[in-house]
């Protein structure tokens, strides 16, 4: 029977089932494949069971109950038919819950869940809360994005996270693990943030992993093992049977927000942040014959002029059914004073980046010819200045913001605390810090040339020597641009002592924050947090993405990744000097995210801040070329000797070492002296990147399938959150949430848009079809779960409205690719700095005028 059949035919199908003439499963596949069901969907019920954004929903095996997790850190089991809550569980999580699943064959009594702080909880509904709190796994270093259970296996589950690892846990072996730097359960080390996983339903030993380098990798789990089982391979290519990347994303780092196998396991659906949804056949291998872009072509594409916009954290005005593109708002005269202010600040930021970029390019040639360690005074004077005197320091990287997410900026291991320490862009910088999570947007990274970067570092050091150093510790504002977490790009404030800032910058040590900053969904709590809170470590997404740049083989470039598709062309620091207090307000915007370093305040705990909204802005598109880092020893005195000896000993290790480098936050090295800690972090990052680069080179020699895209689904907008799901519905339909607050449903075989449902006031993140019936559950930024059923009397699809929404989404998708989300405190500091600059200018004009008057009097 054709998919376009009518209801009378369906009634006959039901009659045949009652007579035993047809298999019930065939009937289900037939009615789920009918357009009349899809186009008659109507909101049946709303479950108000949470006090925060609902980031994960999951039906149980029988379709009777829904398990949900939220920013309120609670797990709730509810009955969607009676609208009642069965169980509310205080999970023990201290950050937004991103994924929660029932373990199969446990009668819905056992649950595994993960959150933005990387902690995984194993919960038994029948046990008390205190016992359940003991069953936690703190093995992941950064955000844990997803939990995946194995069909018909009640004992094991998998997880993936910002640290680039996929871990396999067996509850028969242990129900908790708080071991420091645990690597016992690592199944795969992707060297890049692993943001989504999926298991093939009919063949559960096939595992698909979505990474922040735009790739989807498929592994055969029979060829893999962990250290706990004694057969850990330690190579990211072991067991890999296929690797998929859309051709136009080959040289980019675009995060995968969702992976889903079809019921028959023949196709995989992949949703990319700040891009579209792709369908591919994992058994296909036709992409192998296509010519891959050369390194020069990749670099050329990275040289896009950065265009930056600013968005305040908690500003969801560009989401929801009533959101409009900027061009449409201007045409209708809807520009608000707030928008006007943000636009002026954005223009100023763009101007700074352009000036810094020009200076970086002019210095690039001189930097290559200048001998190591030689930086002339004239070079320092050529640094761009903001209206008055603030220096803008740029690590020659093109920063391209795709989808900004509010990500918490983490202090880089050493440069985090110093506005001058721009070493965060150094290629050998240490890993990332643990992320806090709420909702991040996709960001792209900066690509930095080693030579230019080196020159810039030297000018930074000279600048420090020339700058005044007060006798007492002065507060220095350090801003870090981070891309880890669930929202794209975020800027976080951190106050540090100027002495430590200078010391760290003089060492020339920096770390890439691989953490993708997280953005707080609706009610950002951290936007005005005290400075101490900002010093918390968060796992960055960027560092993992930076590593991917290595595969391009450009040894001279140092990539900086940003969750928001930001081609950050520079990491800049605006250091306006307050003439009255001598305080320097350092605005350190590091697109590669610094690894949190021990700051003057001892409060850098691993405990993450929880953001009000969990919708994570996809930290996706990153255009980076990761050059092989080259060590630069800029330290002096005993610390330099200690650092050098540590590095030399580490260099003796080979790539085949059992110590598999993982993306680790710099805070893990707090135990040792600052110099040694930073050196260890940098060395470990160096080996991690080198190992990833070698594995990428091996892919060309291995028999790994490379599928082509079978179908592309467009019209939705996926840029503000990192947890946006795409899913199959039956055998004939594909669906996805969107930043416009709608649910999109397409024909799986033709990509025709068939249905549009308004399902959230801001963003729809989660879509889970009922396992048997034509019922759909959805959730997003709103604090509820919505249940949809085919209750309309006639088809209600409005094609004209759908076309309007699609057109707006395309325009706004381009706009959000160039946007950075910043906290309100950043704007206040920026305005204060400009105020100081103006005051200094006026004071200078007055003194100059009085000086001329005195000269005239003397002449008379």
From Swiss-Prot:
Q: What Gene Ontology terms describe where this protein resides (cellular component)? A: Cul4-RING E3 ubiquitin ligase complex; cytoplasm; nucleus
Identify the main location: nucleus
Does the record's keyword annotation contain Repeat? Answer: yes
Residue ranges annotated for the IQ domain, each copy included: 676-705
InterPro entries for the chain: DCAF8, WD40/YVTN_repeat-like_dom_sf, WD40_repeat_dom_sf, WD40_rpt
The record's section on Pfam families has: WD40
- Mind listing the UniProt keywords for this protein, alphabetically? Nucleus, Phosphoprotein, Repeat, Ubl conjugation pathway, WD repeat
Q: Which residues carry this modification: Phosphothreonine?
A: 654
| UniProt subcellular location | Nucleus
Tell me which SUPFAM superfamilies the record gives.
WD40 repeat-like
**Where are the stretches annotated Disordered?**
288-340, 355-676
Regions of biased composition (Basic and acidic residues) lie at 288-303, 312-334, 457-467, 535-549, 601-615
* Gene3D superfamilies linked: YVTN repeat-like/Quinoprotein amine dehydrogenase (2.130.10.10)
Polar residues composition bias: residue spans: 379-388, 409-421, 480-493, 561-571, 627-636
User: What pathway, per the record?
Assistant: Protein modification; protein ubiquitination
Q: Does the keyword DNA damage apply?
A: no
Annotated GO biological processes are: positive regulation of transcription by RNA polymerase II; protein ubiquitination
Mapped WD repeat ranges: 49-88, 92-133, 139-179, 189-229, 251-290, 718-756, 759-798
Provide the positions where the record notes the PTM Phosphoserine.
Answer: 336, 649, 657, 847, 850
Q: Where is the composition biased (Low complexity)?
A: 422-441, 501-511, 616-626
Q: Tell me, what does this protein do in biology?
A: Ligand-dependent coactivator of nuclear receptors. Enhance transcriptional activity of the nuclear receptors NR3C1 and AR. May function as a substrate receptor for CUL4-DDB1 E3 ubiquitin-protein ligase complex.
On subunit structure and binding partners, the annotation says: Interacts with the nuclear receptors NR3C1 and AR in the presence of ligand. Interacts with DDB1, CUL4A and CUL4B.
Entries under PANTHER family matching the protein: DDB1- AND CUL4-ASSOCIATED FACTOR 6, WD REPEAT DOMAIN-CONTAINING FAMILY
What protein is this chain from? DDB1- and CUL4-associated factor 6
